[in-house]
Amino acid sequence: MTEDFEVNLGTGGEDNSSSTMEHRVLDSPPRVVIPEDTESPAKLAPNHGIFMASINKSSPAGKKSGEGAVLGMGAQSTKDNSTPRQNSSMLSTRVIESLHDQVDTLTSTNLQLTVQSKNLLDKLDTAQQKESKMLENSASLKHENENLVSMLNRKTRRLKDVEEELASHKKNHDSLEEEKTALQKKWESSSSEEATLRQQMEMVQAQYDALVDSHQYYKSHYSSQISTLSEQLENLKLEQRNYTQRVSDEANTFNAKLLEFDSKHANLQQAEETRVKYLESKYDSLTQQLDLPSWVQLYRESKNMVLEFAEKMKLKIPSDFETLIQDPELTALEAKNPNSNNAAALPLRVAKQRAGGGNATSTQSGTSGSNAAHGKRSSFYGGMASSYPASTLPGTLPGVRRSSSRRKPSSRVASDNSNSGDSSPIFPHSAVATAPRSSATAPSSRVSSTSTSSSTNHFAFHNNNSNNTYRKRQESTSVGNS
């Protein structure tokens, strides 16, 4: 601890009142407890000399005496330089006087300093006592301060904990406030919904009462209708039983008729199969009698001639003719008979004529008449054709005169011509009934009748009676020609 002390310097009360004393602030000595025996002068002597020297340097009397001494020494030196002998006595006297003055001054000063030092020692004792008390107070205050610091730390930690708890409680409070707000809104909405539901419940209750009343009404109404419908249902059941019995009787009758029809159909199918077999055998025999390669060769020559003529004359071939020559059956027949290019190698079959007989005579006369009538008709190329010799081979080109011989008629070709509705058949049955036909038309009709043999066979199957009659007549005609 630091204390300030004021030291008054002077020789007496007059000096203190008349002159200004110099004040010096001294630092307190270190905190060392001085024992009571420090008041002895022997122990204070070293420090007293140092203290007095500093006082002399700082006091004005000392300064004056020093200055006087210096002046005296200066004057003495000057006197010594001028008159050393005269001034030596005066100088010594003055030095002695000054020394006496200094001794008196120092004595008074010593007394004053002794009194002052005693006062200072008293003050030092009191200050040390105060310091010891203050040290004790400081120690107690320090201990109390430590206790207060520890308590403050505990309170600070407690305060932090309390602040954390306060923050958590604030968060909980905010969340509870939000939850309260949400619950308040939910309660308000639930209250409005409750009011709405009450209104709806009242409406539903009214509707339910109305439905109960209507249910009672409809129950009574429909119970009466159900009783009526049950009576009608009983009547309908009775009618249904009668109708079922009647239908079962009719079904039994129909089954008996159906069995009878099945037996008749089986017999008819068997007869039909027998007739088909007979027709197939007849068709095979007629196919064997028919000279098919010669007809194919004749068709090929006619087709080539027509195409060549149309190319030379620059004529457009009709679409019917193109369709005819592109017929798959005719193309297949041409492919099956690739070796029938020579007409002389495969001549057409002709029926032999008898020398006598009415049929032969009529045939010859009819043939000669037809040849005479068509002897000068137009040829195929537009010119007038002359009479051709009778030695022309059969199967020649169209436009030639036929010989007196006749082919053996085919029942298949005749049936095709009769079914197609042609009034003038290709192979005449007698000389009187034969109509003159152009030789250019006859080969194409024969070929077309041959190409449609399968379709006409089915048609002849359905027209059984007419075919049988025509077949018998054709057979009799062929027998007469032979």
Curated annotation (Swiss-Prot):
Membrane topology is: Peripheral membrane protein
* GO terms under biological process: endoplasmic reticulum inheritance; mRNA transport
Stretches of Basic and acidic residues bias are at 173-188
Point to the regions of Low complexity compositional bias: 430-469
Q: What is its main location?
A: endoplasmic reticulum
Q: Which residues belong to the signal peptide in this entry?
A: none
Q: Its Gene Ontology molecular function terms?
A: RNA binding
From which domain of life does this come?
Eukaryota
Q: Name one GO cellular component term.
A: endoplasmic reticulum membrane
Q: One short Pfam family name for this protein?
A: SHE3
User: Any coiled-coil ranges, and where?
Assistant: 127-292
Q: What are the record keywords, sorted?
A: Coiled coil, Endoplasmic reticulum, Membrane, mRNA transport, RNA-binding, Transport
Annotated spans, Disordered: 1-90, 163-190, 353-378, 390-482
Places the protein is found: Endoplasmic reticulum membrane
Q: Does the keyword Coiled coil apply?
A: yes
Q: Where is the composition biased (Polar residues)?
A: 75-90, 360-371, 413-423
Q: Please give the function described in this protein's UniProt entry.
A: RNA-binding protein that binds specific mRNAs including the ASH1 mRNA, coding for a repressor of the HO endonuclease. Part of the mRNA localization machinery that restricts accumulation of certain proteins to the bud and in the daughter cell. Required for the delivery of cortical endoplasmic reticulum into the emerging bud.
Q: Which family does it belong to?
A: Belongs to the SHE3 family.
Name of this chain's protein: SWI5-dependent HO expression protein 3
Native organism: Zygosaccharomyces rouxii (strain ATCC 2623 / CBS 732 / NBRC 1130 / NCYC 568 / NRRL Y-229)
